[in-house]
């Protein structure tokens, strides 16, 4: 009997030992696939990613950022992580989308990481072309700047923002007297208010509808609003020259640049501030998975956020004292396209060319 019990206990002890050993092995197993690396939260995350990235040698980055906005982060990444070269394919988001779709359909995966605006990010998410990820920096980002997936992961995270608001020429209109959208109906704005009819204009209309309702927007027609088929920067120049007294379609960065040159231009955030956001994401498959995740972490780091701020872009991790409004929030890509079309239609109805 004693021998039988001892034998049973020995078998149980071996089973427990094997179970513990198996658990220990599973806990110490290092991630290797893109999905595993993207979800890894170990203390050695950066070290592990860097070692793998150096073995891979490069990262292929698709982005719609322009000029110094992509060159400076690229240089900083290569300086911080020598041995990992950044190869960039840069284009407008619409062209990026076509390229990514074509490559995905052909099962030819060249892209490691993506940085582009939210409409394209939404489209790729809807087509199930993303690998969810986490990052040690994301705890500092508000929920609105992160698209949740399962298990504490995210499909994308906003890494930079641009803000449009009301720019006024102070020789025409006094800045101190302007606080919100309602003030645009005051007599001193009549004949002086202009909108860009590029993307910035319809998004401004969307913000006004969200904050004040469509009836308020229709009241602006009595203000003899002028419409301009030019860029947001060109509209800012019209305000600076005095051709326009004010425009709610001017980016903060453009107004700051013009004001720094001595022009009497002041930028005022309104009830809602339409926010153009760029976000980072991972594709469904990446040829250089370690480098891909390393680049995503880097783009969300305080180091790159400081680079963007130096270039007059905003960080989603900071509070600038106004209420951001992401026009795409709460909509899928089809719904956003429909809403954008409606905003543009209303803008043309209240304006004069």
Question: Which residues does each PLM region occupy?
Answer:
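Short, polar/charged alpha-helical segment
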Residues: 42-54, 60, 64-85, 309-313
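Extracellular/periplasmic bilobal clamshell ligand-binding domains
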Residues: 304, 319-353
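Periplasmic-binding protein-like
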Residues: 143, 161-163, 189-196, 200, 219-221, 226-229, 299-321, ...
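A bilobed periplasmic-binding-protein/Venus flytrap-type ligand-binding module shared by bacterial periplasmic
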Residues: 165-172, 208-209, 276-291, 307
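Bacterial N-terminal signal peptides
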Residues: 10-21
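A ligand-binding cleft/hinge motif common to bilobed small-molecule-binding domains
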Residues: 120-123, 245-264
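Extracytoplasmic ligand-binding site segments that recognize negatively charged/polar headgroups
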Residues: 60-75, 86-104, 108-243
